[in-house]
């Protein structure tokens, strides 16, 4: 049970053995377009955040089981840095911004908030809020600023530990 708008039921069914993983299925067009537009979104973010630098591409972190009681891996769309400061930067495409809530708030969809919260928790980049850039219709870009929340991060860890332990029972 998770908060993903699209993947949670399929992933859960795959882990339960009800459904096989379809590795040969092509990614959806919006998913592919999202990756195609990441360099443009990175450029927008850099222009709006002078003094910060971005990694040239995705950055992956592998977290050993002993860190949180379960193994994990996380991939950031970009890692931002300014001096010794680091922050998570994530990019998304949206065909319809109405699903993203009020543009003038930082009320991003729960599954994306959970994603960047986990990214901050796993990387330790918690001193600066994560920034979630969404590129909508007509190339309208909005940045959601998501501060680290220790309570939410702990809840994510708790759920992941329970899930990881459940795999041993299967």
What is each PLM-predicted segment?
Residues 9, 42, 116:
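Generic structural marker for isolated residues within well-ordered, non-membrane alpha-helices
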Residues 40-43, 55:
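Nucleic-acid endo/exonuclease domains
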Residues 1-36:
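Charged, glycine-rich intrinsically disordered N-terminal tails and low-complexity linkers that flank
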Residues 10, 40, 158-159:
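Alpha-helical structural elements
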Residues 33-40, 152:
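Short amphipathic alpha-helical segments
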Residues 31, 47-76, 80-168:
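Nucleic-acid nuclease catalytic cores
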